Amino acid sequence: LDGTIYQQNRPIKFADKFISYLQKEGREFVFFTNSPEKSPLELKLKLSGFNIDVSEKQIITSGQVAIDYLLCHNKNCTVFVIGTNQLKNDFSNSGFNVVDSKSKKADYVVCGFSRSVDFSDIESACRYIWNGAKLICTNFDESIPCENGLTPHTGAINASIEYATGEKAIMLGKPGSYTFEFLQNRLNAQKQELCVIGDRIDIDMLFGKLNGIKSFLVYTGITSEAEALDPKNHGFFDAGFKNLKQLMDFDKELCQGPKPHYVFSAVPKESV
């Protein structure tokens, strides 16, 4: 999303035309963000403001992946969630018993992201883990871009909990395999039918490489063309493009036979 479809609160040129092209061609695609901060509905409304009309089901967050993981592994568990009220409500609405800092015990600590996280949240998370809770992290992004450079993100919060407790988190989000399997099931596709589009080599393109799918890099976000051409980054992606129009033209020429499904992938950025 951010860096691929829009830059914070501004649409990226050709994004709406590219999505319209995919829709007219009958292509299946989803948007995935590593940030658990906003709900699919909030992101759908944001996209609609950029003339991009998609359903909530086409937008997936790392928070949803965390919920799916627990539904598959321990759907009757109690959880302590570090994150926004929206994320806590999502867990509660999915049937989990979400506890606050006053409870005596939790089965899992879910480390998400919120700009209002404070010491008491981290202290409570550590206490639950010392008492036997397992740690899950929605995404390991230690920092994300913002208007003033960088700002800490989920990975930084998680690192403090890991350091204090010695407990290693179960890593979800990109570039993990569980997230890939979740997206693959959502699209009901084989690996050879999938490709990922993103703007960051160390997360988006690595996601494709580790999970064995084609990866297309666009130079509209984090990674510049010069960085992409650096020899150290060779082998991390299949092709690079200046913008989505160039990718669209490439797709028109390439796809005379079976056409791939797309996963639009992006590192989260600070919301303005």
Q: What does each model-found stretch correspond to?
A:
Residues S35:
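Conserved phosphate/oxyanion-binding catalytic-loop motifs
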Residues G3:
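Receiver (REC) domain active-site loop signature in two-component systems and cognate sites
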Residues Y6-K13, K17, Y21-R27, K38-I60, ...:
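Asp-based, Mg2+/Mn2+-dependent phosphohydrolase catalytic module
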